[in-house]
Amino acid sequence: MKKLLAAFAANTVFANIILILILVGGGLSLSYMLRETFPEFSVDKISIRVAYPGADPEEVEEGIVLKIEEALEGIEGIKEYTTTAAENMGSAMVDVLEGSDVSEVLDDVKSKIDAVSTFPVDAEKPVVTEVTMRRSVSMLSLSGKMSEKQLKVLAEQLKEEIRALDGISQVELFGARDYEISIEISEEQLRRYGISLAQVAEAVRSSSLNLHGGTIRTQGEEIRVRTVGRKYTGKELAEIVVLANSAGELIKLGDLATIRDGFVEDPISSEVDGDAAAFIMVFKTSEEDSIHIADTVKKYMAAKQGQLPPDVHLQEFYDGTKELRSRISLLTKNGYMGLALVFFLLWLFLDLRLSFWAGMGIPISLSGAMFILWWMGETLNMISLFGFIMVLGIVVDDAIVVGESIYFHRSLGKPPLKAAVDGVAEVAMPIVAAVSTTIVAFVPLSFIGGIMGKFISILPVVVNASLFVSLWESLFLLPAHLSHLPDLRKRKPGRSPLSWLQRGTQAALEWFISRIYVPFLAAAIQWRYIFLAFSISSLLLAVGLVQAGLVKFQVFPKLDSFLITSTVEFPEGTPAAVTKQAVDRLEQAFLKVAEGHNTAEGKSIIEKRLKLVGQSMGGEQGGNGPHLGSVQFILLPSEERSVHSNDLLVALEQEAGTI
């Protein structure tokens, strides 16, 4: 072991090359790593959705849900499943057994569901997908004084423009009703023209199609023939010929029917700060960068706002990268502070060159860990950043111990290279043992099962990678850089105030060691059994305080949030008016609570508020129905208000009472 340490310590050029490669590799890895708020992973669930327009829950239960349950019986890899029958929709959520291949189970479920031939004729094609933890990056609100159709058209336009931006592929619109063309024909009209409703439906169906007509090949080119006949507006549908009478007169759909070009009857309504609104939610895929998406959306908004009518407002209601940016900023700030503290304290007690190279352990360790994460295909997210912040104060410990040991051997008058080798060899095994115990302590986190295990799986990787690189750097690179320390006995004392401060600090430390620490250590060794009993008693006391509840314990503490959401869900079939009344009540209750916590300048702690009836938050995945409603508030940053978000929630529950 000592020969290996000596070989590295003697080869300064090689150490410098490795150092540069680690720093450059870490920097490049950081630039290529994707950034996201939380890691994406499979939750081992499969979703089955079958739309059945116009059906009530009983019809959905009989025609859709029971057929799904029959199809799922006997499929290997399924732990359990739950089914739901709602208006216009039947669905099932399948839990996959832990350890089973989700892709294989998904294929089996798809083939079984697609093989069902007894679904109602009016039912749409089943949609079978794997459920993933999809994260929204940004949510925009479009509001203003305009008709519902104008709002919908403009929102659709903005949605498509955002989807066309670089690095963005998933954009959804919610809070607005879908288009619908209704055709109403009275029985009197049908009798008058001697036609049935089925004939009218068939005429509409057959006359609103895009058909492929084949290919015409010539010597010079190939021409593809396609008949474009699909109708998209009420005016186009009104021109469809339904019947030709004996006199050759053409009876068009507009002659016998009332055609309304409008929206579905779903009672969806949404507001932002009291104005009618539609919402555009931007998601990320596993191949996209959250911060890049958020910045791109912000630039688009800034350019688009000037092109909109004066009374139309496009604003970012929610920025999902705010916490991620804050965590990155915290890591950067803590890194600089740690580097500065290590540099200053080691310079104060030991040597300037030693303080520099020991402090370099922080960027080297983080850079090496970044490269390992990039090589493993991981991302920079809240969990990995938490790991970096947690390990930031540990990675430099071994470098400090090695550096101090080399400094001590050099102060004895040994040649620089021998002092470096003897110094690192003396503390190598204790350092390896100390770092190994920390690594082993984090290894069990890699074996936690379920969703929580997948959620935090990156944490032990970050910590252990950082510790491994730090250990390797302190044993093999640091001695090479400290193998040129000058003879400390021949160093002339400086006369500057900083030199006086350094000598005074060193003298104070030596006095503390000789007069306080050494006598205390001698007493502890002499009366070791008493000190051991005292240590064990202190440990038992600490455990007892936690077990007795005197010291509170929380796995995840309640942090102050800038976002408060209150959701209501009534039994299916509840009228939208009842849901809206409950949502209005929650909104007014929170406005009253917030009014009592205005800032010192009299400013409200609420920046924005959203109200949604007929659809849950989350867009297409959340579900629709008149029994669903939500109200959401964006608060001022925590440093600008004097009340915690949890206290506001408690006050809201008391003010709103039982719904």
Residue positions per predicted region:
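Signature of alpha-helical transmembrane segments and their immediate interfacial
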Residues: 1-35, 427, 496-554
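Hydrophobic transmembrane alpha-helices and their membrane-interface caps
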Residues: 26-32, 37, 340-407, 465
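Hydrophobic, glycine/alanine-rich multi-pass transmembrane helices and their short helix-loop junctions
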Residues: 344-349, 368-383, 432-484, 544, ...
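Transmembrane helices with small-residue packing motifs
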Residues: 20-56, 114-123, 378, 446-455, ...
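Interfacial segments of transmembrane alpha-helices in multi-pass membrane proteins
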Residues: 2, 6-16, 286-289, 325-381, ...
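Helix-loop junctions and hydrophobic alpha-helical segments within the transmembrane domains
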Residues: 317, 324, 328, 403, ...
